[in-house]
Amino acid sequence: MQPFRLHRGVVAPIDRENVDTDAIIPKQFLKSIKRSGFGVNLFDEWRYLDHGEPGQDPASRRPNPDFVLNQPRYRGASVLLARRNFGCGSSREHAPWAIDQYGFRALIAPSFADIFFNNCFKNGLLPIVLPEAQVARLFDEVAAFPGYELTIDLERQVVVKPDGDELAFDVEPFRRHCLLGGLDDIGLTLRHADKIRAYEAERLLRKPWLANTLAS
């Protein structure tokens, strides 16, 4: 998992409340057994004028020119600005996969759905909760200034605006530690690889019959 320490990026606004996971990545794209390739279908039903199916070439489809991510001013955006209760609905981990694979590194909203919030951290995304008034102000500034960028400093836990104004946010210490170190669940487990190997060796000494069981 890619570490997250300091990130600066263009902000793309999704100006809707209660954006659910089916809007983030529609259900027909959940059939894939792979964990990659979801970014091209992020916000698929808003992003395209035609109905999409798994494996379809995005170049053959009709983009919706009015949707935020199709507008030139938001090209290359890596910070997603949203309204309250973002990520509600069914608990599909494909939603943060799609957001990450599109190229977003952080999300800012007044609130997130709990399961989606947890899944973001597990997949290297930083969901930032700010007061609603601050989020509303950011929406105004993004609309007023094309190419609007924010700098997100996870070590200091601040969002830095173009004018230097800083917005403080909180991240639970263990989650902050994992993001700073680029540690997902597998990475955390591998940090104890020596202890795991030592335990397995000691267990086989005590219970040698397990060797045949494990080999089969």
UniProtKB/Swiss-Prot annotation:
Q: Signal peptide location in the record? A: none
Q: Which domain of life is it from?
A: Bacteria
The enzyme's first-digit EC class, named in words, is lyase
Gene Ontology terms, cellular component aspect? 3-isopropylmalate dehydratase complex
The entry's keywords? Amino-acid biosynthesis, Branched-chain amino acid biosynthesis, Leucine biosynthesis, Lyase
Record-level GO BP terms? L-leucine biosynthetic process
* Pathway per the UniProt entry: Amino-acid biosynthesis; L-leucine biosynthesis; L-leucine from 3-methyl-2-oxobutanoate: step 2/4
What family is reported?
Answer: Belongs to the LeuD family. LeuD type 1 subfamily.
- HAMAP family xref list: LeuD_type1 (MF_01031)
Describe, as the record does, how this protein assembles with itself and its partners.
Answer: Heterodimer of LeuC and LeuD.
**Purpose:** Catalyzes the isomerization between 2-isopropylmalate and 3-isopropylmalate, via the formation of 2-isopropylmaleate.
Write down what this protein is called.
Answer: 3-isopropylmalate dehydratase small subunit
